[in-house]
């Protein structure tokens, strides 16, 4: 069972993902490196938590868009 992320991690991750949609994607390592450059003074653990949530958030958005396209094509 996974752990629950703090609200500030979720909020920060969602804000960054929405603000920079072309920067972040569904690859954790790439997201982590980009975050390390954007926020050099944040701890490694926090960077990993934010990068993990951004990755998950990006995958969910991609799946949701795919589902909507499929639903629209059926109608």
Swiss-Prot record:
Protein name: Small ribosomal subunit protein eS17
One GO biological process term: translation
InterPro entries attached to this UniProt entry: Ribosomal_eS17 (IPR001210), Ribosomal_eS17_CS (IPR018273), Ribosomal_eS17_sf (IPR036401)
Keywords: Ribonucleoprotein, Ribosomal protein
GO terms under cellular component: ribonucleoprotein complex; ribosome
Gene Ontology molecular function, alphabetical: structural constituent of ribosome
UniProt family annotation: Belongs to the eukaryotic ribosomal protein eS17 family.
UniProt keyword Ribonucleoprotein present: yes
